[in-house]
Design a protein with these regions (language model features):
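Short, basic/aromatic beta-hairpin or loop at an interaction surface
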Residues: 1-9
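Short, compact, well-ordered microdomains
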Residues: 3, 60-89
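Short, charged beta-turn/beta-strand-edge "cap" motif at the junction between a beta-strand
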Residues: 15-16, 33-38
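Short, compositionally biased
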Residues: 40-57
Length: 89
């Protein structure tokens, strides 16, 4: 089985108050299950993008092939996460 890249999800912007208590600067190592302490709604929104980055994929609309941004689905208190692929050790 090919190795998978690590992906870090970092909160880079916030409007309103997150019901899960997330704040700008929070970081999570994304795996195949919801990281401890991460809102499950946010995880469900970013999981498909994180999976693509983990397997070496990229997004044609991004300038950096190792990252993308994803918003959580809360329309009244949105957070934006930056997903960044890390190197394989």
């Amino acid at each position: 089985m090919p190795e998978m890249y690590d992906v870090i999800a970092k909160v880079i912007s916030q409007e309103g108050e997150c019901s899960a208590g997330h704040r700008v600067g929070d970081e999570f190592l994304v795996g195949q299950t919801t990281p401890i302490g991460m809102c499950s709604w946010a995880f469900c929104a970013l999981f498909p993008f994180a999976t693509a980055l983990q397997s070496g994929g990229s997004f044609p609309w991004e300038d950096d092939e190792d990252s993308t941004t994803v918003a959580c689905p809360d329309p009244q208190n949105p957070l934006v996460f930056e997903l960044t692929r890390q190197g394989i050790d």
